[in-house]
From Swiss-Prot:
InterPro entries in the cross-refs: Ala_racemase, Ala_racemase/Decarboxylase_C, Ala_racemase_C, Ala_racemase_N, Ala_racemase_pyridoxalP-BS, PLP-binding_barrel
Origin superkingdom: Bacteria
Upper taxonomic lineage: Bacteria, Bacillati, Actinomycetota, Actinomycetes, Mycobacteriales
Binding site for substrate: R144, M323
GO molecular function: alanine racemase activity; pyridoxal phosphate binding
Protein name as catalogued: Alanine racemase
SMART domains referenced in this protein's UniProt entry, alphabetically: Ala_racemase_C
Recorded metabolic or biological pathway in which this protein acts: Amino-acid biosynthesis; D-alanine biosynthesis; D-alanine from L-alanine: step 1/1
Gene: alr
Family: Belongs to the alanine racemase family.
Swiss-Prot/TrEMBL cofactor(s): pyridoxal 5'-phosphate
Active site: K46 (proton acceptor), Y275 (proton acceptor)
Amino acid sequence: MTTTPTMTQKLPQALPTASIDLDAIAHNVAVLREHAGPAAVMAVVKADGYGHGATQVARAALAAGAAELGVATVGEALALRRDGVTARVLAWLHPPGTDFAPALLADVDVAVSSLRQFTDLLDAAGRTGRTADVTVKADTGLSRNGVGEADYPALVDALRRAASDGAVRVRGLMSHLAHGDDPEHPFNDVQARRLTEMAKLAGARGVSYDVVHLSNSPAALTRPDLAFDMVRPGIAVYGQTPIPQRGDFGLRPAMTVKCPVSAVRPVRAGDAVSYGHTWTAQTDTTLALVPAGYADGVFRALSNRFEVSINGRRYPNVGRICMDQFVVDLGPGPVDVAEGDDAILFGPGTDGEPTAQDWAELLDTINYEVVTSPRGRIVRTYVGGKGGPQ
């Protein structure tokens, strides 16, 4: 097992941990590959691998057959390169003033969303003497990041000229679904049609794309007709279902967040707990203190609403969640919880523990937000995994 501290290199024992199962990552990539059919799989490892650790997830995904990697920013791509990941990686979100030279020097593919970005990329190619591998990010209806229909022809013409000059290699055309988590929504087909038309327009103007990709996790699992040349799953790589109402798709959640109990103490009926005394013991009972709080990603909005699992049994949080700690009620009578026992905040759910999806439903959010939230003093650890391509 390897350990990666999120904030500090010198760590005391018994800190909260996010344990990442790399075998689950490999399993999930295998599931996605099966659904993708002949299409390749790009494993998206942006946002530090959705909170799971980009480098470790990248290696596990590649070993399981992912063809390449996707990230949001050039900085994320360069971090993978610094860690020795040599596989193809595409970055697609660039603030104004981004210098693409480091990306080109590190053999990072760049997706551009405007003629301005493409001009900046050409400038970097000229300064470095490197040929840029470029993908066009197209807006087909999400109205977010991507070149729109009106500006697309000018960008295609600029691509053709730059490719003719040897400044760029045209690699791909990509877009992103607005209703991917609603597979039957008619707008999914509208976006696919628009993307196809954009590829045809480019061909008519002398530009051809090696790969076209549109599908995110839910589409990769439910809409094989939208696979094009490659699918681009994110959350499914980490085992979280992208469409909870349709089940888990055979995915295995890779993250378990747990924290050792730091104190066990009895209280009497009438004693109140934590800030504001929002919970009062109705009987004599025993409490356990768990040293993780909202600074570590335990949402304060979960106060008095969620449970943890200790030694295979669930216990409710009582009182407000604090910055560094929260309290659970072990109930009256003898208890089988001691200091040092792990309180599982969420995990795969296979042993009855709460899941990230449970938290998402309590918070009226999505499991994406839950798994990207552990931070602060939470230490990332890894189990499973094996060597493979980087």
